[in-house]
A protein has these predicted regions:
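Leu/Val/Ala/Ile-rich N-terminal alpha-helices, chiefly Sec-type signal peptides and the beginnings
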Residues: 1-66, 196, 200-201
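An acidic, Gly/Ser/Thr/Pro-rich helix-cap/linker signature
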Residues: 11-15, 65, 124-126, 186, ...
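Generic structural signal for well-ordered, non-membrane alpha-helices
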Residues: 15-23, 38, 42-45, 69-76, ...
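Secondary-structure edge/capping motif, primarily at the C-terminal ends of alpha-helices
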Residues: 21-29, 47-54, 71-85, 106-113, ...
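Short, charged, amphipathic alpha-helical segments
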Residues: 30-35, 89, 93, 148-152, ...
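Hydrophobic, ordered structural segments
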Residues: 60-90, 95, 99
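Charged, well-structured binding/catalytic surfaces in domain cores that contact anionic ligands
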Residues: 84-158, 203
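C-terminal accessory extensions/subdomains outside the catalytic/core fold
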Residues: 164-206
Length: 206
């Protein structure tokens, strides 16, 4: 797999996980993830780039496992009414799933799986990731960040993104439009997902 693609995948998932852990505001140390993200950002294009990325990804894996374990404990306590449901966002299960998906992708990258591009596409457009990117929160900043993250991905696929930019601008101007915009946006993304999956299954995406 191309090292630039590995770098993009790493930064994409790290950005989401770091942002979500910050919002959750629980006792999970994200300093190491931020540090590893910076290391990835600072990797220059030289003959050792693949080796460096591989080493960093091996260091990310135990952190993800630790995140998953801690988050699952909190989720189970919420389910068993041992923690107030108001203390943590209801989408904590989605954050667990994102950690698991990223973990699965990293394991495939490290083992040099030749089909990683296709499988990564399918994983990325899975319901869990899609839900996380479309989730409506009370805060505008994380909403805006998630929309921009998705737009950047679509832009990399040479897809017309004007309509997505228009939706972000509407979100900025009028928070009351969120639910209606989200429904319209969801339909557009769903169509795009189906289109991408067709390409994947026809082996037209490399």
């Amino acid at each position: 797999m191309d090292t630039n693609n590995i770098k993009k995948i790493d930064l994409f998932y790290l950005n989401i996980i770091i942002e979500e852990l910050n919002i959750l505001n629980i006792e999970i140390d994200i300093k190491e993830l931020i540090k590893l993200k910076e290391e990835i950002n600072n990797i220059s294009n030289n003959i050792f780039i693949k080796l460096k990325l591989n080493n960093i990804n091996k260091r990310i894996i135990p952190i993800l496992n630790n995140n998953i374990n801690k988050l699952e404990v909190i989720r189970d306590k919420i389910i068993n009414n041992k923690i107030s449901i108001n203390k943590y966002p209801s989408y904590i299960s989605e954050i667990i799933n994102i950690n698991k998906l990223y973990l699965k992708i990293l394991n495939k990258i490290i083992t040099n799986n030749k089909n990683i591009e296709l499988e990564e596409e399918i994983l990325f457009w899975s319901d869990n990731i899609k839900y996380n990117l479309l989730v409506i929160r009370s805060d505008l900043d994380p909403i805006e960040t998630n929309y921009i993250d998705l737009i950047n991905v679509l832009e990399n696929k040479n897809i017309d993104i004007n309509i997505y930019i228009d939706l972000i601008n509407k979100l900025k101007l009028d928070n009351n439009l969120r639910s209606r915009i989200n429904n319209k946006y969801y339909d557009l993304i769903l169509n795009k997902i189906n289109y991408l999956k067709e390409l994947i299954y026809n082996e037209e995406i490399i």
